């Protein structure tokens, strides 16, 4: 459903960028306005974000098996994604204080957290093959499986609400909650070593659905998600 819903609701996203840009933006040191002498050059801010992304990624040991060119692209994707998501997660009617360090927290309400969740799912899917012809199970769903599927079903409704209200923070929160739910699901229930092949296939398909929604939603926010991190 998410592919058609994205096409159907894209028109609602044409004008919200102007609403976001009209909100007050501050750094921890003060407002980003030239009349107060604290204007921040966009290129400098982006460079800083990419640098912070590189530092955090290296500290977490997430740079193995990457070529140098791939690392540069990854740092840029994380840094710019963190900046965009931090700005878009706030109600456009409210004042926001942008903290570069906070925006690249891999465990918080941030773009990198969602990007990492997507990459984690893609890693699982690379190691396990989905049998597209497998039948739907008759046994009851685990509570976490059901909760994830229910939240996935809310994607179309969330797109409509966010587009109608010109408020991308609605979508940002939805994606964050979905990523949180998946990580709880991933920690509690085995996918690769599920209790049966049927359960394994079910969880792989749920994981694939979550990854697709995360990628689609982030792209609507103008943010790329890496295939691996």
What residue ranges belong to the model's regions?
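Single conserved hydrophobic/aromatic residue that forms the stacking wall/gate
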Residues: 1-21
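Non-catalytic interaction-recognition regions
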Residues: 18-229
